Amino acid sequence: IIAKASDRLDTALESYVDKVTIEEPSFTDNKYLTMLLSFMGNKPDVNTHKFMLVYNKNVDKSGMFQDSYPKSDDGYLWLELYHYRGTDVEVEPYYIYNCFKISPKQLGTKEFSEYKGIKILHKPIGKTNNTEILTIKF
């Protein structure tokens, strides 16, 4: 799911606090972002896990990644990746390819040609609570 952050979405994201690492990102000309996501789990049923890629339209960038944003516009489209593991427990790493269709019109952003690329904030597995930034240049 890719969505714009809003008050309703902010409430829904409160449970999306589990860690996820991004590997092998690929952005195509037809605006599909494919990533290999790694996360901790115990069930082989990956449908237990939910992922949400969010454009934070809030001026103050409030939320889990607020402190990771640059102080001024750096020319990139910034997105936030969230993970919810449901009732699954963290036992071993699992991997899944996930594909997101990104539409500037849907997000209410500038066209991709006006950006240098995309930066995705995420909390990777196997680390402290630090945020990492994945950069995809156009």
Model regions and ranges:
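Transition segment at domain starts
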Residues: 1-23
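Short helix-loop boundary/capping segments
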Residues: 21-86
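Generic structural detector for well-ordered beta-strands
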Residues: 26, 99-103, 137
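Intrinsic-disorder/low-complexity, polar/charged segments enriched in Ser/Thr/Lys/Arg/Asp/Glu/Gln
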Residues: 32-34, 97-99, 133
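Short loop/turn segments at connectors of secondary-structure elements within structured domains
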Residues: 45-47, 114, 130
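Short, solvent-exposed, Trp/other aromatic-anchored flexible loops in extracytoplasmic proteins
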Residues: 82-124
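Short beta-strand elements
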Residues: 126-138
